[in-house]
Amino acid sequence: MIRTDAKDGALVLFSGGQDSATCVAWALERYQTVETLGFDYGQRHRVELECREGVREALKRDFPAWSDRLGDDHMIDLSVLGAISDTAMTRTIEIETAANGLPNTFVPGRNLMFMTIAAAIAYRRGLRVLVGGMCETDFSGYPDCRDDTMKALQVALNLGMDTRVVLETPLMWLDKAQTWQLAEQLGGEALVELIRVETHTCYVGERAELHDWGFGCGECPACKLRKRGYEAYLKGERVTEAPL
C-alpha cells in the first residue's frame, strides 16, 4: 500500500543492479517524488548502466500506482574515480582477496563520493532523503557499506551543508534472500521478475546467458551471492518477512 502521508522527495542511488532497483521500488512506495541518480566511473560492468532506463520504463509501465511518482533521472560522469582506482571493478584483472582481507573489487571512497554528490544534487532539487542499497549483512566487507559509515556520513553532510538530509539504507540488515522477498512484498511477482531479468549484478559485465536468478557469469562473487540469495528465497528459507 502506498503511503499518502509522504511529504519528502527522495533521490535514489540507482546503478541498474538488483539492490538499487529494489531501493527505487522501496522509495516509490514511500515518497511522492522519487528521482534516480547513476554514476559512470569507468566500471568494468558498465552494462549495468545500460539497464537503468529499461528498469525505469518498466516501473512506470507495469506499476501504475508508482508511475507519477518516478521523476527525473540524473547521470554523473565520475571518471576521475576510475582514474585513481586500481581495482578489479575498474581494471580487467583477476578478482581476488587483497592482503588487507578485502576483495580487490573494493573501490576506495566510492560510496563516500556517491553520497556526497547525491547530497549536493538533492540540495539543489529540494529533496530531503537519499536512498542507497548499502548492506552489511550479505556483503563483501566493504567499509563504505557499513551502517556506522552511513550514519557518520549523514552527520558530516548535514554539518557541511547546513541542511537536514536523511540517508536511508533499507537493505542494511537484509540478506540477499530477504532482498528478493522485499521486492515481492513491494511489487509482487511482477517486480521480482522485472529485477531478475532487467537488472545486472555480475562484476565482469557478462550478459549473454539468463539464469534462473538473472544474467551473469555465475562465477564472480556478485553472481554467487545473487544466485544463493535467489535460491534461498525460492525455498522460503527466510521465515520472517523482510521489514518494509
UniProtKB/Swiss-Prot annotation:
GO terms for biological process: queuosine biosynthetic process. It is an enzyme of class 6 (ligase). Its EC number is 6.3.4.20. It comes from the Bacteria. Pathway: Purine metabolism; 7-cyano-7-deazaguanine biosynthesis. ATP binds at residues 14-24. Gene3D superfamilies: HUPs. Its cofactor is Zn(2+). It catalyses: 7-carboxy-7-deazaguanine + NH4(+) + ATP = 7-cyano-7-deazaguanine + ADP + phosphate + H2O + H(+). Binds 1 zinc ion per subunit. Zn(2+) binds at residues 202, 217, 220, 223. Keywords: ATP-binding, Ligase, Metal-binding, Nucleotide-binding, Queuosine biosynthesis, Zinc. GO terms for molecular function: ATP binding; ligase activity, forming carbon-nitrogen bonds; zinc ion binding. NCBIfam families: 7-cyano-7-deazaguanine synthase QueC (TIGR00364). Belongs to the QueC family. Catalyzes the ATP-dependent conversion of 7-carboxy-7-deazaguanine (CDG) to 7-cyano-7-deazaguanine (preQ(0)). This is 7-cyano-7-deazaguanine synthase. It comes from Burkholderia lata (strain ATCC 17760 / DSM 23089 / LMG 22485 / NCIMB 9086 / R18194 / 383). The lineage of its organism: Bacteria, Pseudomonadati, Pseudomonadota, Betaproteobacteria, Burkholderiales. The gene is queC.
